Amino acid sequence: MSTEANKPRGNQHQEAKSDAEIAQAAFMRPIVDVAAEKLGIAAEHLAPYGHYKAKIDLNYLSSLDSRPDGKLVLVTAISPTPAGEGKTTTTVGLTDALNHIGKKAVACLREPSLGPCFGVKGGAAGGGYAQVVPMEDINLHFTGDFHAIGAANNLLAALIDNHVYWGNELGIDPRRIGWRRAVDMNDRALRSIVSSLGGVSNGYPREDGFDITVASEVMAIFCLATDLDDLQRRLGNIIVGHTKDRKPIRASELSAAGSMAVLLKDAIAPNLVQTLEHNPAFIHGGPFANIAHGCNSVIATRAALKLSDYVVTEAGFGADLGAEKFFDIKCRKAGLSPSAVVIVATVRALKMHGGVAKDALKTENVEAVQKGFANLERHIQNVRKFGVPVVVGVNKFSADTDAEFQMLHDLCAKMGVPCVSSDHWANGGAGAADLAHEVVKLVEGGSADFKPLYPEDMPLWDKLRTIATEIYGASDITADAAVRKRFDELQKEGFGHLPICVAKTQYSFSTDANLRGAPSGHVIPVRDLRLSAGAEFVVAICGDIMTMPGLPKVPAANAIRLASNGTIAGLF
């Protein structure tokens, strides 16, 4: 084994400035060494993708079932702002910090989508000295999982149109085909299209469209399936459309599930990479947090729990969306029980919630921190409703003042919640050691008594109303007669036991993206109700849903380039 493995990073902190420079300057250990030394996994149970990425054999993971589970820690955040919060960075930094203080910890993250990488968001591998690597690979094709998911999605679409072309034995109504094609790219031109043009030999023309791969139900199924059998069962349960008599048509009736599962058989094995400090990270799956549940795969999470003492994972957007779905969908369905929650906040984001413009965030404003705390306070109250202890993790920025942090600390103290400042972006795991100690204290305190927000047998309408009033601070929900009828239909058809997945803006507790802070007394309008029978949840659409994003006027792709030596510049 190379002695390079144990060398410190030296003065990389001074030499490298951007996230990309830090990642490219990092020394990576062979992933087989990380797996062996950190997780006890022999090389024979790995399928390497080069030197620094690998998939873990599902049969090996099945052999771990008798092992006790480690402790599950969720990292969530306040409502997102343009100022940024750093949820992924904190997830990675906390994982490194737990290892730094002597705990055996693993990170569990979602895979980034190509669309946002080339659009406006950039990469999603953490930041500063709290990153997962190889950063470029993770942000681009990685191990090909998303391509496999897109292929499975589009195979089903092809089988639907092929069935209609060759006589339509099932009587599928072309006007009621709900299954759309998918591509992992931001491309607004594909949102609504007309397919099968060009003559009789090309099929029956109809309105169609594309979703970005991370919005596909196949992605949600991929992340909620517990094994290959469950994956194939769920794929078969997908409802692709209806007959003229409104009878649902499932993928199993098209004999599609087997072929779709075959396309996913390698992808479903979890991916293993490493942090900058050579700690293991599972990165697997990546559903949208609005149209789906916004969490990494159940298979990866379960594997990590069998292989470590602490598993640090994250859920998309703020705690009102990501954490609620993590608890009510992922944990409920997978039998997971979290031991602690970290709510990530920044002083500057709280100031934005307090009414400060982005260009004025560097000016001290203690009053705005106090006012913006209402948003964090609501999230703390919400997480407590699930019976899980909370710590507030504050990402430090150079413009933060002592007075501003003291105000935040005092407000948290009044709620009986620990508030810990971290600078893992600048100092890696050592910079989050205090946060790690606080998380261990919460976990070992044994106060967690996890329970979902609502029981399975509660009617669908009441489930959604419970989420709206208990989590969003709304006074009620409202829907027109057609949507109310859809609630009743799903209830009568036997889907009333499924959890609700709310699709709404991530920027506010309301459906108005511009309403920051902690609004209350508003009414949540329900525009539509969609059944994801394979993923086994009901999507309540409470705002404009964008399942195929577009590129901005100046996309991130314009700044990305490839050097003659193969180095990528401008990705992150």
Curated annotation (Swiss-Prot):
Residue sites binding ATP per the record: 81-88
Any one GO MF annotation of this record: ATP binding
Main EC class the enzyme belongs to: ligase
Catalytic reaction list: (6S)-5,6,7,8-tetrahydrofolate + formate + ATP = (6R)-10-formyltetrahydrofolate + ADP + phosphate
Superkingdom per UniProt: Bacteria
Pathway note: One-carbon metabolism; tetrahydrofolate interconversion
Keywords: ATP-binding, Ligase, Nucleotide-binding, One-carbon metabolism
Gene Ontology biological-process annotations: tetrahydrofolate interconversion
PROSITE patterns membership: FTHFS_1, FTHFS_2
E.C. no: 6.3.4.3
Signal peptide interval: none
Gene3D superfamilies reported in the protein's UniProt record: Domain 2, N(10)-formyltetrahydrofolate synthetase, Formyltetrahydrofolate synthetase, domain 3, P-loop containing nucleotide triphosphate hydrolases
Family statement drawn from the similarity comment of this UniProt entry: Belongs to the formate--tetrahydrofolate ligase family.
Protein name: Formate--tetrahydrofolate ligase
Phylogenetic lineage: Bacteria, Pseudomonadati, Pseudomonadota, Alphaproteobacteria, Acetobacterales
